[in-house]
């Protein structure tokens, strides 16, 4: 298992953000997600209940990152829609995204990430890293910031003591950029 470094991933996401237009960036975000999603889907089997749980888990993360900064950004929504269609699920409408966001709790999101992270040792390191990078991309899509809520959720993908992720928001802000 290869250690992850949040600062390195965020620097890469920021650098790529400045080189691409919004459509290219949302496409890249979706592509990064699909590799890990497909491999996890192979592990859990093609049982509709398991597939649905996996999709809903990813959907929760997309919705949280889309809405956590209290702004609706079309690019983030476009990336979510592309991913949903790729996964063969109907994307939520904007109003449904807003309603789901109101129901999400931090505990739900931590459970969702724990579920995904439980597959880390069973999928290719590069695919897990690509998945985390996809959510870094998504958090920067359409805006110029990475907010505290996004930081605390994304850091749940990191294993404390093995991966590098600053311990708190203030340390992260000092180290990034």
Where are these regions (language model features)?
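Small-residue-enriched hydrophobic alpha-helices in membranes
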Residues: 1-67, 71-177
């Amino acid at each position: 298992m290869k250690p992850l470094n949040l600062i390195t991933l965020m620097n890469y996401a920021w650098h790529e953000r400045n080189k691409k237009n919004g459509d290219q960036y949302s496409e890249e975000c979706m592509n990064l997600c699909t590799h890990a999603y497909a491999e996890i889907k192979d592990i859990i089997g093609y049982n509709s209940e398991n597939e649905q749980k996996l999709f809903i888990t990813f959907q929760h993360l997309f919705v949280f990152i889309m809405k956590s900064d209290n702004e609706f950004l079309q690019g983030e929504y476009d990336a979510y829609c592309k991913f949903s269609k790729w996964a063969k699920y109907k994307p939520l409408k904007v109003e449904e995204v807003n309603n789901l966001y109101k129901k999400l709790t931090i505990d739900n999101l931590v459970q969702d990430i724990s579920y995904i992270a439980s597959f880390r040792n069973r999928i290719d390191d590069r695919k897990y890293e690509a998945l985390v990078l996809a959510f870094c991309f998504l958090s920067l899509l359409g805006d110029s910031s990475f907010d505290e809520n996004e930081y605390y959720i994304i850091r749940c993908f990191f294993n404390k003591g093995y991966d590098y992720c600053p311990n708190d928001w203030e340390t992260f802000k000092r180290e990034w950029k």
